[in-house]
Amino acid sequence: RPRRVLIVGSGFVGSEIASVCRDLDLPVTVAERGKAPLVGALGGVIGDIAAKMQLEAGVDLRTGVAVEGLEGDAEGHVRAARLSDGTVLDVDVVVASLGSIRNVEWLEGAQLASGFWGVACDAGCRAFDINGVVTDNIFVAGDVARAPHVLYEYEFRSQEHWDNAVFGAEVAANNMISLEMGRRPHLPLPSFWSGQFGVNIKSVGVCSFGDEIV
């Protein structure tokens, strides 16, 4: 049984793992660079509520800090973590929940509009080349795809969720084998849910485009 679990990052996965740890009555510390959990996805107001949920559940929440190093024993087991504020924590399980980086390195030299944020494509999942011209026979789907969304001022957005990958692949496959009149757009309404600390958090739409938080 771990003395203490350290979770690095407090996005959805990190927060859900922290919730499970508390359900199992495991001591858990969450280290987060930002001001609050979930703040990147849901904003500061919801982030403050998420922080309160964690603290009330007994999570040792540390915000505004990073993990600078891990220390182990002679057998290679982690025993301590050093935080950027100088704190040293006794831990024996560390979970890195730092998000994902899109794998576009293999596209180097392909002359596509690809980079750190993914591969740019149109609503029909067709990739753009480096000059911003849409291609006719290269299609993109999944987390790596970034397309303009009509509901959000045509801002290029990627949706990192399994259902977007499934539905995007369906649209891409349809458009690969269809003539122009048979092609259709992939314009999903962003949505997800997350169960943590006895609360089901559900989001529909994009928080930054909301008019009011109540």
Residues of each region from the PLM?
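Mid-to-C-terminal Rossmann-like scaffold of FAD/NAD(P)H-dependent oxidoreductases
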Residues: 144-214
